From Swiss-Prot:
Residues that, per the record, bind GTP: 166-173, 191-195, 213-216, 283-286, 315-317
EC number(s) per entry: 3.6.5.-
Keywords: Cytoplasm, GTP-binding, Hydrolase, Magnesium, Metal-binding, Nucleotide-binding
Keyword presence, Transcription: no
Name of the molecule in the record: GTPase Obg
Functional note: An essential GTPase which binds GTP, GDP and possibly (p)ppGpp with moderate affinity, with high nucleotide exchange rates and a fairly low GTP hydrolysis rate. Plays a role in control of the cell cycle, stress response, ribosome biogenesis and in those bacteria that undergo differentiation, in morphogenesis control.
Biased composition (Acidic residues): 387-396
Length: 402
């Protein structure tokens, strides 16, 4: 199934039914009072987090959803039937944004979580409500209220504890295959990973966390180059970033410069994202069999990058060092979760930090998209102008017969 992480839809809640004008008509009661019922309520529109879907592809093809209208009122003071609500199922991790105002309506992060996105209109009043001491037979009823109409953007961000970042072919997909049951495509060419992959990492009984692998970043990614920047928003919810660095790139490039590329692109795209705790994984140590040479190379990379955080040496081919990373991540995540439970101030600070991070990532993603669209428009216009300037008749005198 095609992976779609954004969709724009229009939702229309149902209008309320109309109240009616009606009077009692019974034998021996020729002048019965008013008995017009109220209109029924229009249907609401909800979104529901569903763990059976992982893409917004359905909303690329059906872009409008209308709830039903409430029934009109009936005689004998019977109200019209309310319309059924409609429920739009989205993957866990979907954010609902008002596309016209940019306001975030809600975030669906738990299975079965529901969010009201468009409220149905209330039904109109029947003439029973307008009876008074001076008007015993009112001929007045009101129409139902209109349901809400909204244009919304659905934004999917995968829900993961750890995000993998790095250049293409750094070994991210092989790493997630090694530590989880995820089976992303692995090959010897760049951009093998085209969409985010999720894997559940089991560390022990009732101990696990979720890891996300996104397409590799390249230099210029923050300006729209490559695939990774489009999916960088998917690591905005993570607690840790795992920076996978190939210490012996097959193309002969400098691993230090490769590491700087990722750090620079991350900082340029989102300083808040760059401030997330990062762990450096010096990968493919099996490519340097000499222990002294390997140690010297790893120390050189760490020193040149000025890295002060945790560092691990791994081989995703042989599995060396991978378990150490798993246990370290699990312990860090559990320690942070326990502190959030025990310290309300820390929990609130974490919540505010993630809100700032998501807002910054959303803004920067939209700006990058606009810049990319503007560049494409400029390229098309330039190509069109070049075609107009390409005159095959240059230097040829054309004489028109009378």
């Amino acid at each position: 199934m095609r992976f779609i992480d954004e969709a724009i839809v229009t939702v229309k809640a149902g209008d309320g039914g109309n109240g009616i004008v009606s009077f009692r008509r019974e034998k021996y009661v020729p002048r019965g009072g008013p008995d017009g019922g109220d209109g029924g309520k229009g249907g609401d529109v909800f979104v529901v987090a569903d763990d059976n879907t992982n893409t917004l592809v359905d909303y690329r093809y059906t872009r409008r959803y209308d709830a039903g209208r409430g029934e009109n009122g009936h005689s004998k003071n019977c109200s019209g039937k309310g319309a059924d609500n409609i429920y739009l199922r989205v993957p866990i991790g979907t954010t609902i944004v008002n596309n016209e105002t940019g306001e975030v309506i809600g975030d669906l992060t738990e299975i079965g979580q529901e969010l009201l996105i468009a409220k149905g209109g209330d039904g109109g009043l029947g003439n029973t409500h307008f009876k008074s001491s001076t008007n015993q037979a009112p001929r007045k009823a009101t129409s139902g209220f209109e349901g809400e109409l909204k244009e919304l953007k659905f934004e999917l961000k995968v829900v993961a504890d750890v995000g993998l970042i790095g250049l293409p072919n750094a070994g991210k997909s092989t790493f997630i295959r090694q530590v989880s049951s995820a089976k992303p495509k692995v090959a010897d060419y760049p951009f093998t990973t085209l969409v985010p992959n999720l894997g559940v990492v089991d560390v022990g009984v009732h101990r696990s966390f979720v890891m996300a692998d996104i397409p590799g970043l390249i230099e210029g990614a923050s300006e729209g180059a490559g695939l990774g920047i489009r999916f960088l928003k998917h690591v905005a919810r993570t607690r840790r970033l795992l920076h996978i660095l190939d210490i012996k790139p097959i193309d002969g490039s400098d691993p230090v410069e490769n590491g700087r590329v990722i750090l620079n692109e991350l900082e340029r795209f989102s300083p808040e994202l760059a401030n997330l705790p990062q762990i450096l994984i010096l990968n493919k140590i099996d490519q340097v069999p000499d222990a002294d040479e390997l140690n010297e190379l790893c120390l050189h990379i760490v020193a040149e990058l000025g890295w002060t955080g945790a560092v691990f040496r791994t081989s995703t081919l042989t599995g060396a060092g991978v378990d150490d990373v798993k246990y370290h991540l699990m312990n860090e995540i559990e320690r942070e979760q326990e502190r959030e439970e025990e310290d309300p101030m820390f929990a609130q600070a974490q919540k505010e930090r993630f809100e700032r991070l998501e807002a910054e990532v959303r803004l920067n993603t939209e700006e990058q998209k606009e810049a990319y669209r503007a560049a494409r428009r400029a390229a098309r216009e330039a190509a069109f102008n070049n075609e107009l300037d390409d005159d095959d008749d240059d230097g040829v005198e054309v004489v028109y017969a009378p």
